[in-house]
Amino acid sequence: MTLNLCVLTPNRIVWDSEVKEIILSTNSGQIGVLPNHAPIATAVDIGILRIRLNDQWLTMALMGGFARIGNNEITVLVNDAEKSSDIDPQEAQQTLEIAEAALRKAEGKRQTIEANLALRRARTRVEAINAIS
């Protein structure tokens, strides 16, 4: 039995295919979803989406949004999403270093909050590449 997973951003469909299982980062922690999961709607945190296709796991970096699960269908609407295979490792590492430097230089509450958010996004992209599946 499978689940239909659809990952959408405001600009494109990132994923629309059947999967065996997912592990989703929510604002209250990670949840695993298998076929016949109870219906829920949840906020999606900045984090990794793990997708199981048969015996293979794939990862995707999600940049926050929400998900609806029910009737073996999962719809994930996020601000942005990238498959790990589409992320350039060198560019992701550079972005992480820039975000870390920006946080060190941040002055004031607003700059610190924005720098922390940029750092979380950058770390998520690096984690998506390095995820052990």
Curated annotation (Swiss-Prot):
The subcellular location is: Plastid, Chloroplast thylakoid membrane
Kindly report the protein's main subcellular placement as a broad class.
plastid
- Asked if the record carries the keyword Heme, the reply is no
Listed A to Z, the keywords are: ATP synthesis, CF(1), Chloroplast, Hydrogen ion transport, Ion transport, Membrane, Plastid, Thylakoid, Transport
InterPro entries with a match to the protein in the record: ATP_synth_F1_dsu/esu (IPR001469), ATP_synth_F1_dsu/esu_N (IPR020546), ATP_synth_F1_esu_C (IPR020547), ATPsynth_dsu/esu_N (IPR036771)
Q: Which cellular components does GO assign to this protein?
A: chloroplast thylakoid membrane; proton-transporting ATP synthase complex
Q: Which GO molecular function annotations are given, in alphabetical order?
A: ATP binding; proton-transporting ATP synthase activity, rotational mechanism
One Pfam annotation, family name?
ATP-synt_DE_N
Bilayer topology annotation: Peripheral membrane protein
User: Function, please?
Assistant: Produces ATP from ADP in the presence of a proton gradient across the membrane.
The family annotation for this protein states:
Belongs to the ATPase epsilon chain family.
For this protein, the record's HAMAP family field holds: ATP_synth_epsil_bac
Among PANTHER family, the record links this protein to: ATP SYNTHASE DELTA/EPSILON CHAIN, ATP SYNTHASE EPSILON CHAIN, CHLOROPLASTIC
Q: How does it assemble?
A: F-type ATPases have 2 components, CF(1) - the catalytic core - and CF(0) - the membrane proton channel. CF(1) has five subunits: alpha(3), beta(3), gamma(1), delta(1), epsilon(1). CF(0) has three main subunits: a, b and c.
Which NCBIfam families does this chain map to? Answer: ATP_synt_epsi
Output this protein's name: ATP synthase epsilon chain, chloroplastic
Tell me the classification of the organism that encodes this protein. Eukaryota, Viridiplantae, Streptophyta, Embryophyta, Tracheophyta
